[in-house]
Amino acid sequence: RRQRQMCIRDSMNTYQEVRPLAAVGDGKELIQWSERDGWAHLYLYDGEGNLKNRITRGPWHVDQIVKVDEAKRVVYFLANGKEKDENPYYEHLYRVGLDGSGLQQVTPGDYFHTVSMDDNAAFVVNNYSRVNTIPRTDLMDSNGRKLMTLEESDFSGLLAAGYQFPEPFKVKAADGVTDLYGVMYKPFNFDSTALYPIIDY
């Protein structure tokens, strides 16, 4: 019987989030998600729990690992807050070498991206939308090249009935520095000269 042993230990002075480890080469290497430096990033360990290198770094947030291409030694992951002048809540798919080189955005565009990849990490099904756009689904290769549109929602009936998209907005917090993001839903018969009650949720 194989004995259990601790491979990786992580600690913080605050509440600690965790994500599943990704095994590479049947456990000869491990990819860990950690918030140890105040941002969520990926770290590469050997099978004994020795840190080999950081994979990602910077003032942005890795959310989760999507796929590891072991043959090319590339990890695909979802992250947010990296793209300047975009809503930091919007997730994108990125790829980077396990040695931390070659970081590349796979799903461009100021949208929230939900993705799935095939077992060989060759193709990406990219579902993307915002509250003020019509959702679409594209098939892409793993470098981010669009191959075809798979589906686009039909909003014609809603628009004909008077539907209007909500309006995203950005304001400064009380500190005058921090950006706050929100969405405004107006009545479909909105009159800019009238007064309306506001529900802050």
Residue spans for each PLM region:
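Conserved beta-strand positions that form and line the central face of beta-propeller blades
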Residues: 53-55, 92, 105, 149, ...
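Beta-strand C-termini and the immediately following turn/loop, strongest in propeller blades
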Residues: 1, 19-37, 46, 55-56, ...
